[in-house]
Swiss-Prot record:
This is Large ribosomal subunit protein bL27. GO terms for molecular function: structural constituent of ribosome. GO terms for cellular component: ribonucleoprotein complex; ribosome. Pfam families: Ribosomal_L27. It comes from Sorangium cellulosum (strain So ce56) (Polyangium cellulosum (strain So ce56)). Coiled coil: none annotated.
């Protein structure tokens, strides 16, 4: 058994690409239907009024309007889109 690891071997040098998750549109911003509001793992922010949920828990606007973030209960946050009138 060699007690040194051969000349050119390296065990490091790998890195995965960033997932680009997080809030994409903040409160008070205008959105169009279909715009992505939040990319997330699991439902840490829930879908409120006029907001849909994708297969990967992505939240998106169902109507044109203005984004608001509000507390659903003491522990759960939700995002809603209200039509601009």
């Amino acid at each position: 058994m060699a007690h040194k690891k051969g000349g050119g071997s390296s065990r490091n040098g790998r890195d995965s690409n960033a997932q680009r998750r997080g809030v994409k549109v903040y409160a008070g911003a205008p959105v169009r239907a279909g715009n992505i509001l939040v990319r997330q793992v699991g439902s840490s922010i829930h879908a409120g009024h006029n907001v849909g949920t994708g297969r990967d828990f992505t939240l998106f606007a169902l109507v044109d309007g203005v984004v608001t973030y509000e507390w659903k209960s003491n522990t759960k946050k939700q995002v809603s889109v209200y039509p601009a009138s």
